[in-house]
Structure formats: C-alpha cells, structure tokens
Amino acid sequence: MTAEYTKPVRRITNTEDLEIWNGSQAYSTILDFVQDLQDSVVGLTNDAQVTVSSSSEELLKVLDKVNEIIENNPVVHEKDISRFGKIEFRDFYDEICKKSFDILKPLVEKLEDDPRIELATYFNESWGNRTRIDYGSGHELNFIAFLACLQKLGIIKHEDYPCVIVRVFTKYMTVMRALQKLYWLEPAGSHGVWGLDDYHFLPFLFGSSQLATHPHMKPKSIHNEELVESFYKQYMYLECIHFINTIKTTPANQDQKLSLRWHSPMLDDISSAKSWAKIKEGMIKMYKAEVLGKLPIVQHFMFGSIIPCPDGVSEYHEHDDDSDCGHDHGGTVNTWGDCCGIKIPSALAASEMNKINNPNNKPIPFD
C-alpha cells in the first residue's frame, strides 16, 4: 500500500484543542518517545561506547551539512552594532529549507515511499524562527518530532536510542550553540531567570538521566565550579550549567562568577533535590506541564500523516502558517514555556557585545 505523506500544518488554536491534544495518541507519541530516550541514557556519559548504526551515522552527516550551511552564511551586516538577532540567520534558514530534501535523502533511500515532505517540515523548524530570529523549546520540540517520525518510519530503532542522545542530540546541541552564538538568537519567550536555560529544556531532561545512578555526584554538585569545569563535556546537564555560568557574569568584572541563585534561581532550587533520580522524574513532569501542556508552544506544533492530528481539533486554516506568531495566548500567563515575549537581546548577545566593547576582558555580561 502506498503511503500518502502530506506537509504538516498547525491545527491547535484554543484551549479546547489543547485539552484534546493532552489526551491524544499524538501527545503520547511524543511524550513516550522522550521518556524512552531519557531512560536509554541512564548512567551513560557523552563519550560512552554506544552502537552507531548506519541510520545514526547518516543523522550525524545531516548535522554536518547544517554546520556547512552555517559556514556559508557569516554575519556581515551590523556585525558589531545591533545586540538583537542577526539578519543573516534568515539566509541560513532559507538555505536549510532549500537544501533539506537533498540533505535528508540518504536517510530515506531504502523506503518505498518518500516521506521528506513531512520530515523536512519538522527539520526546517528545528533551528529557530526566521521572522523573529529566536529559538526556544518549541523549536527543540520540532527536532524531537523529526526524530519521532524517523522512529515511526523504522529508520531509528529502539537499540539506536542511546546513540541518538549521546551522539546525535549532543551534536544538535553543539550546532544550536553555534547558531545562538553566531546569530545572537533571542530566547523565545524571554523568561529570563525564571527558566531552566534561555533556550533549551531537553538537555536537562536527558542530562538528569545520565547522572541518575552516579555514585558520588549529587544535585548540589552543580555549585562546584571546578567539578563542572572537569565534567561538563561528559554530561549534558553540566554542559548547560557551564554554558550559563560562562555567559552570565558581571559586566564590570568578567572573571567574577555569579551565583546560580542570582541568575538561575529555578536551577538553584532544583539542586536541593535529594537525588538525580528525583530530578529525572521531575523533568518529565515539568516537560509535560511547561512544554507539551502550554498552548503558546503547541499552537505551533504541526501534524501530518506520520504524527496525525487528533480528531476534534480545529480545522486547518492557511493563515495559521504565518511565519510570525500568528496567535493569541488565551489570556494566560505562562511560567516558562511561552513562545512569545518582550523582544530583548539574549544574555549571549550581551556577552558577545561586551567582548567587542571590552576586548581586554573575558566574557561576559548579563543584563
């Protein structure tokens, strides 16, 4: 039987749709996949010896291609002036969209039918928003949806999951850090200190699993700067702490590290947990509440034939695919995962600007 693949589109528009989504098979597809990925890396470091299948190798090559496109689109306009997102990100985004079918072709060559119309849609939206030049948990969710589609197509198998996280996802994170640093992507939502990270959620979710069985390292260890410096390349959670500590210092004295309590109180609170296993469990609950359960985020989620839309959800309207926000927020105030917010420069952008203005200082200011 020939599969009929269709371009995924937005369907969720209101709280009634959100309730349907929360009880749907599509919701379970994403949540179960994330939980299975999390469970697959319990106790594993980023450099653990894992089986790298041919599909995983192709995924790593896909990310290499994304890196090449970044190199093709350097920042030249107002390079040292504007502290907001760099417009060259749009050139990067356009090139991704133009080349994504070719980039993804090796992944699907063995399939009878070509699903790239669906895969490319999630893939293209995994890097940020072209109009707002920002990035947040909704874009990260698109990358997970892309991987979930590969799993449903049989390209990624359960035995690939450890490699998908400690090789593929960590490489995706490296690509995203490069994009954030080069194009000064703004944090989607702009929740500042009340978020886990200006951009990401999942490295904390997967990273807590890596540490869940560690015999010595405790949650409060994130306050030990020397320990974080020694192990951040091995654990995603510590990489995020290292990244945050690096970009959030005092403008007057770049060498002066600020307390997590000051610039990341949520992470500071989480560090008081009794064990990483508790944090691992809590991260799933938080992901359900603050990402999959937030209308401003899932209003942007797209449904095709691989991840079908739940019955009863609002019909698709062409204007729902506007490149800008294109929705209201239902009159609600969101605690973490809002897709929109006051347009502010990222802490990373402030960091890079300070290096330009104060070349003799080390990074980096947080304002």
UniProtKB/Swiss-Prot annotation:
SUPFAM superfamilies, alphabetized: PTPA-like
One GO molecular-function entry: peptidyl-prolyl cis-trans isomerase activity
Isomerase found in the keyword field: yes
Subcellular localization: Cytoplasm
Major subcellular site: cytoplasm
Reaction it catalyzes: [protein]-peptidylproline (omega=180) = [protein]-peptidylproline (omega=0)
GO process annotations (BP): mitotic spindle organization; response to osmotic stress
CDD domains: PTPA
InterPro entries: Phstyr_phstse_ac (IPR004327), PTPA_C_lid (IPR043170), PTPA_sf (IPR037218)
Gene Ontology cellular component list: cytoplasm; nucleus; protein phosphatase type 2A complex
Any Pfam family hit: PTPA
The keyword Flavoprotein is assigned to this record: no
EC number(s) on file: 5.2.1.8
UniProt entry keywords in alphabetical sequence: Cytoplasm, Isomerase, Rotamase
PANTHER family reported in the protein's UniProt record: SERINE/THREONINE-PROTEIN PHOSPHATASE 2A REGULATORY SUBUNIT B, SERINE_THREONINE-PROTEIN PHOSPHATASE 2A ACTIVATOR 2
Family: Belongs to the PTPA-type PPIase family.
Protein role: PPIases accelerate the folding of proteins. It catalyzes the cis-trans isomerization of proline imidic peptide bonds in oligopeptides. Acts as a regulatory subunit for PP2A-like phosphatases modulating their activity or substrate specificity, probably by inducing a conformational change in the catalytic subunit, a direct target of the PPIase. Can reactivate inactive phosphatase PP2A-phosphatase methylesterase complexes (PP2Ai) in presence of ATP and Mg(2+) by dissociating the inactive form from the complex.
Name of the protein described by the UniProt record: Serine/threonine-protein phosphatase 2A activator 2
